[in-house]
């Protein structure tokens, strides 16, 4: 599994129940996330056997899908669920395997987030850089490419929804900074469990805010 740094093409994923328990989400959320990964061509569901990571070239997933697809509320919801399943593992691995150079890159992105509170676009880019730096710190090449793919999709969606108060109000930007700071501190301390918890809290908050936006603004 991703959490242990052992995910590779051909591996069988844990059961829906096991994934739900591991990442503290509902079974329906796991099923939706797996369906999104299947749509991306990253996993294969075999009847009566389970779900397997597909064999593919890393460069096949280097380009994001069309942002237009993601403007539907349900698509964004599924993307965020996929991120939750992936990035909790990323945080744990980063805490275990990060180098000093990795920590410096993560901290640089964090500092940039804290210094440009009034600029939503640059804030999005710094947020993006923070999460990709965490993925780099996992020292898992496949996981880094998976994260780059999913995060690129999210960044495109963010650019299309700049009115979201998450990136337009100083108070919410400060909250985001503090959430990322907690993730960084846990990774720097080498505390995998704390890093997982901080990432889960962050992504749950992002999910709640974006869901609220789509409820109010997108039919």
From Swiss-Prot:
Pfam families: FCD, GntR. One of its GO terms (molecular function) is DNA binding. The keyword Transcription regulation applies. Gene3D superfamilies: GntR ligand-binding domain-like, Winged helix-like DNA-binding domain superfamily/Winged helix DNA-binding domain. Keywords: DNA-binding, Repressor, Transcription, Transcription regulation. Residues 16-35 bind DNA. Residues 1-56 form the HTH gntR-type domain. InterPro entries: GntR_C, TF_FadR/GntR_C, Tscrpt_reg_HTH_GntR, WH-like_DNA-bd_sf, WH_DNA-bd_sf. Transmembrane segments: none annotated. The keyword Cytoplasm does not apply. SUPFAM superfamilies: GntR ligand-binding domain-like, Winged helix' DNA-binding domain. SMART domains: FCD, HTH_GNTR. Disruption phenotype: Cells lacking this gene show a derepression of lutABC expression. They are also defective in bacilysin production. PANTHER family: TRANSCRIPTIONAL REGULATOR, GNTR FAMILY, UXU OPERON TRANSCRIPTIONAL REGULATOR. Negatively regulates the transcription of the lutABC operon, which is required for L-lactate utilization. LutR activity is regulated by lactate, since presence of L-lactate, that probably binds to LutR, leads to derepression of the operon. Also appears to be essential for bacilysin biosynthesis. This is HTH-type transcriptional regulator LutR. It comes from Bacillus subtilis (strain 168).
């Amino acid at each position: 599994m991703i959490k242990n740094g052992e995910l590779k093409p051909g591996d069988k994923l844990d059961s829906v129940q096991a994934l739900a328990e591991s990442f503290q989400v509902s079974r329906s959320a796991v099923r939706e996330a797996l369906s999104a990964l299947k749509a991306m061509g990253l996993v294969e569901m075999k009847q009566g056997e389970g779900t397997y990571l597909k064999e593919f070239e890393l460069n096949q997933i280097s380009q994001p899908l069309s942002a237009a697809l993601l403007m539907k509320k349900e698509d964004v919801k599924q993307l965020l669920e996929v991120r939750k399943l992936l990035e909790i593992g990323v945080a744990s691995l980063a805490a275990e395997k990060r180098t000093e150079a990795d920590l410096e890159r993560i901290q640089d992105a964090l500092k940039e987030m804290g210094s440009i509170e009034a600029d939503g676009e640059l804030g999005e880019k710094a947020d993006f850089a923070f999460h990709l730096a965490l993925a780099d710190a996992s020292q898992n090449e496949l996981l880094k490419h998976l994260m780059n793919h999913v995060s690129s999709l999210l960044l495109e969606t963010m650019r299309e929804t700049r009115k979201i108060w998450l990136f337009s109000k100083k108070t919410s930007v400060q909250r985001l900074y503090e959430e990322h700071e907690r993730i960084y501190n846990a990774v720097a301390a080498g505390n995998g469990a704390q890093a997982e918890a901080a990432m889960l809290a962050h992504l749950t908050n992002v999910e709640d805010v974006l869901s609220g936006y789509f409820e109010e603004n997108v039919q």
